[in-house]
Amino acid sequence: MGCQDEQLVQTICDLYEKISKLESLKPSEDVNILFKQLVSTCIPPNPNIDVTKMCDRVQEIRLNLIKICGLAEGHLENHFSSILTSYQDNPLHHLNIFPYYNNYLKLGKLEFDLLEQNLNGFVPKSVAFIGSGPLPLTSIVLASFHLKDTIFHNFDIDPSANSLASLLVSSDPDISQRMFFHTVDIMDVTESLKSFDVVFLAALVGMNKEEKVKVIEHLQKHMAPGAVLMLRSAHGPRAFLYPIVEPCDLQGFEVLSIYHPTDDVINSVVISKKHPVVSIGNVGGPNSCLLKPCNCSKTHAKMNKNMMIEEFGAREEQLS
């Protein structure tokens, strides 16, 4: 890394030290200021930052920071979901009070465009979202603006999160009829996973590599052949905020596309499809992964101009 990159990592580590000393991660002036500083530090795209190659100390800070961000995000969503459900009219008419609502609108549009391209016009009838939380904005945005006839099943292990989320949509005559909430550990869900055309996996379900891969393996075992798995990942300095999903974490899936936003949408998006027959071991050895090149120029025209599409050429050369 160059001097500027080292300074960036040091700034992130300094912010971690300050955040780790907070008495609470619930929304407050101090919490809001520090997390805004952290996000603004990590958002600028920087391909020179590869968190997987950093020293053990920075790796440990990163893992701790991801956990802290997950807790803070949960508190933030809980806070705003509680406010929204206090409205006498339809709470979904006031979603713009959530400070990151516009990011979810952009992310929802991006993910819908990816689905539209890779499903060749097929509209999913049933979608699962794993790790939906108290403010299930991805499901709400997709159901409201993009998949207007699709049924959404939201899974979360926290009963209080599901109670808030269910109350949030209960006043909407359309969404309330198409959105369902299940309080369960997804590792205990088996047969019903076969009924979904698309499964979304939230960024913070599986906060480290081992946990994430364990969930992916479970989904691969029980999802229907040909079903789509959408995942959130992170790239560059943004990987200090969210876990990274690598193509080779997706054994038994064909990775169709990986998109790295360069605007204020933090998460990268990985879209994959379960193989009808697991044949990964036949390509370059048991630990290799299959990649299908996408029509980048066609897709890029549909995306926000600030989105960056990862090139697959280098990866494909490695596999050949």
Swiss-Prot record:
Keywords for this protein: S-adenosyl-L-methionine, Transferase
Q: What induces it?
A: Constitutively expressed.
GO BP annotations of the record are: nicotianamine biosynthetic process; phloem transport; pollen development; pollen tube growth
One Pfam match, by short name? NAS
Asked if the Swiss-Prot or TrEMBL record annotates the protein with the keyword Glycosyltransferase, the reply is no
Family annotation (Gene3D superfamilies): Vaccinia Virus protein VP39 (3.40.50.150)
Q: What is its EC number?
A: 2.5.1.43
Expression across tissues: In shoots.
What are the GO MF terms of this UniProt record?
Answer: nicotianamine synthase activity
Q: Which InterPro entries does this one have? A: Nicotian_synth, SAM-dependent_MTases_sf
Q: Which reaction does it catalyse?
A: 3 S-adenosyl-L-methionine = nicotianamine + 3 S-methyl-5'-thioadenosine + 3 H(+)
Q: What does this protein do?
A: Synthesizes nicotianamine, a polyamine which serves as a sensor for the physiological iron status within the plant, and/or might be involved in the transport of iron.
Family classification:
Belongs to the nicotianamine synthase (NAS)-like family.
Full protein name: Nicotianamine synthase 3
Question: What organism, scientifically named, is this protein from?
Answer: Arabidopsis thaliana (Mouse-ear cress)
